C-alpha cells in the first residue's frame, strides 16, 4: 500500500536549495605562503605568513602560484599598519588587517588568519558566481508554505483550545447563570465578558541577532544555504528562526516566542511574554490583580503602602521560576502590600514601558489640553498608538484600578492618589534630560488619573 501511495504521488522538488552549498564546496581553499627567512619585529599574533615590509610587486609574484594563496605584509606607505594579500580571480586583493584579540578586515572577527581567509574566499567566490541569484533569493520564499508559521500553528491551536475549555469548565463548576450576572455591576460585567473573548493575535517583530551556525544551515525564509564559516546569518532570540541577514528584512512580524528562549517573566518584553505563553496579558498582571481583588480592596493605602522589599523580590523570583504556577496566595504572603509591590515592580522592570516610548509624547500632550472633550479624544487616539498587547494590559489594569476607587471610603485610594503611584510606574520619559523628565511627572500622574476616571469611555 505504501508503494502505491509513492507511485501515485506527484513529484515535488526538494525544499532546501543546494546551489549555494555546492558553490561553497567549490570555493578555493586557503594556501599560506610562508616566509623562508626570519623577519624582525614580527607581531606576536602573526605566524610564518608574515613577510614584513615587502612591495606589491613582490607580493604579486609570491601569490601567483595558486588561487587562494595569501600572506601578510607591512604597508610601505603606512608603516605600522598591516595588509592581508589574497589571490582570487587571478588577481591580488589587498585588505587592511586589524587585530583586537581577534583578526578582522570587516565586521566579522576570527580566531585565526586561516579562518578569516577561508571565510573570505567562500564569500568572494559565492558573491562573484551567484550575485544575480543572491539578489533574487527573497522573491519566492518558502516561509509561508512550510516554514516557521506552519510548524508552530498546531501546538498553539491545541493550547488555545485548552484555555477555552478550562474557561467553560469553570463556568459550569461555579453555576453561573443569568441571575448571578444581573447582580454584577456594569463595570465588573464588562471586564468579565472581555475575559472570555478569544486570545487576540498580537503582532511581534522578530528579535534577530547575528549568529554563528555550527555545521551546514539553510535559511528558513528563502530555503537557500547560509554560507561562510561564522556569522552566516541571524537568529531570532525569541523564537529561534534562522535566516539570512537580507531575508530578515522580509520576514513578517509574526514572531511566536518559544518558552525555551523566554527565560523569565520579569524584565521580559511584554508582547514577547504574552505570545510565548499564549495569553491575552502577562500572567503576573492577571494573577496579582485576582489576588488583590479577592482579599485586598478594602486595605488602607492599597498600592501606596510599600510591602517588605525582600518578600516582593521573592514573588518576582517565584514568577520567573514557576510562571503561572507561582504561589502568591494568602498562605504564602499574608500582607497584600507584597502582592501590590510585585505588580508595580513588574511594570517598572519592563524594558519597554506599558505606555511605550513611542506613544509617550501623545499621552503627555493630551494631559496638557484644557478642554475635557478634546482631551479625551486625544487620549483615545494616543491609546490607539499602543501595541495591542500593551493596550489590552492597560485596559485590564485601569478597569482594576477603577474598582479600587469604588472602595475609596475604606482604602483611601482615589483616582488622583492612584495616578501619583502609577504615573511614573507606567510611563517613562524617552528624554535623557533629567529636568525634562522631572517636569513631566505631574502630567504622568494626570494621564493615569484620566485613564482611571474615564476607563469605561476610553477602552
From Swiss-Prot:
<keyword id="KW-0343">GTPase activation</keyword>
<keyword id="KW-0597">Phosphoprotein</keyword>
<keyword id="KW-0727">SH2 domain</keyword>
<keyword id="KW-0524">Neurogenesis</keyword>
<dbReference type="GO" id="GO:0005096">
    <property type="term" value="F:GTPase activator activity"/>
</dbReference>
<dbReference type="GO" id="GO:0043087">
    <property type="term" value="P:regulation of GTPase activity"/>
</dbReference>
<dbReference type="InterPro" id="IPR000198">
    <property type="entry name" value="RhoGAP_dom"/>
</dbReference>
<dbReference type="GO" id="GO:0008270">
    <property type="term" value="F:zinc ion binding"/>
</dbReference>
<dbReference type="InterPro" id="IPR017356">
    <property type="entry name" value="CHN1/CHN2"/>
</dbReference>
<dbReference type="GO" id="GO:0048013">
    <property type="term" value="P:ephrin receptor signaling pathway"/>
</dbReference>
<feature type="modified residue" description="Phosphothreonine">
    <location>
        <position position="340"/>
    </location>
</feature>
<keyword id="KW-0863">Zinc-finger</keyword>
<dbReference type="InterPro" id="IPR008936">
    <property type="entry name" value="Rho_GTPase_activation_prot"/>
</dbReference>
<dbReference type="GO" id="GO:0051056">
    <property type="term" value="P:regulation of small GTPase mediated signal transduction"/>
</dbReference>
<dbReference type="GO" id="GO:0046875">
    <property type="term" value="F:ephrin receptor binding"/>
</dbReference>
<keyword id="KW-0007">Acetylation</keyword>
<feature type="zinc finger region" description="Phorbol-ester/DAG-type">
    <location>
        <begin position="205"/>
        <end position="255"/>
    </location>
</feature>
<comment type="subunit">
    <text>Interacts with EPHA4; effector of EPHA4 in axon guidance linking EPHA4 activation to RAC1 regulation. May also interact with EPHB1 and EPHB2.</text>
</comment>
<dbReference type="InterPro" id="IPR051854">
    <property type="entry name" value="Rho-type_GAP"/>
</dbReference>
<dbReference type="Pfam" id="PF00130">
    <property type="entry name" value="C1_1"/>
</dbReference>
<dbReference type="GO" id="GO:0050770">
    <property type="term" value="P:regulation of axonogenesis"/>
</dbReference>
<dbReference type="InterPro" id="IPR002219">
    <property type="entry name" value="PE/DAG-bd"/>
</dbReference>
<comment type="function">
    <text>GTPase-activating protein for p21-rac and a phorbol ester receptor. May play an important role in neuronal signal-transduction mechanisms. Involved in the assembly of neuronal locomotor circuits as a direct effector of EPHA4 in axon guidance.</text>
</comment>
<feature type="site" description="Arginine finger; crucial for GTP hydrolysis by stabilizing the transition state">
    <location>
        <position position="304"/>
    </location>
</feature>
<dbReference type="InterPro" id="IPR037860">
    <property type="entry name" value="RhoGAP_chimaerin"/>
</dbReference>
<keyword id="KW-0862">Zinc</keyword>
<dbReference type="InterPro" id="IPR020454">
    <property type="entry name" value="DAG/PE-bd"/>
</dbReference>
<protein>
    <recommendedName>
        <fullName>N-chimaerin</fullName>
    </recommendedName>
</protein>
<dbReference type="InterPro" id="IPR035840">
    <property type="entry name" value="Chimaerin_SH2"/>
</dbReference>
<dbReference type="Pfam" id="PF00017">
    <property type="entry name" value="SH2"/>
</dbReference>
<dbReference type="Pfam" id="PF00620">
    <property type="entry name" value="RhoGAP"/>
</dbReference>
<dbReference type="InterPro" id="IPR046349">
    <property type="entry name" value="C1-like_sf"/>
</dbReference>
<feature type="domain" description="Rho-GAP">
    <location>
        <begin position="268"/>
        <end position="459"/>
    </location>
</feature>
<dbReference type="GO" id="GO:0008045">
    <property type="term" value="P:motor neuron axon guidance"/>
</dbReference>
<dbReference type="InterPro" id="IPR036860">
    <property type="entry name" value="SH2_dom_sf"/>
</dbReference>
<feature type="modified residue" description="Phosphothreonine">
    <location>
        <position position="192"/>
    </location>
</feature>
<dbReference type="GO" id="GO:0007165">
    <property type="term" value="P:signal transduction"/>
</dbReference>
<dbReference type="InterPro" id="IPR000980">
    <property type="entry name" value="SH2"/>
</dbReference>
<feature type="domain" description="SH2">
    <location>
        <begin position="49"/>
        <end position="135"/>
    </location>
</feature>
<feature type="modified residue" description="N-acetylalanine">
    <location>
        <position position="2"/>
    </location>
</feature>
<keyword id="KW-0479">Metal-binding</keyword>
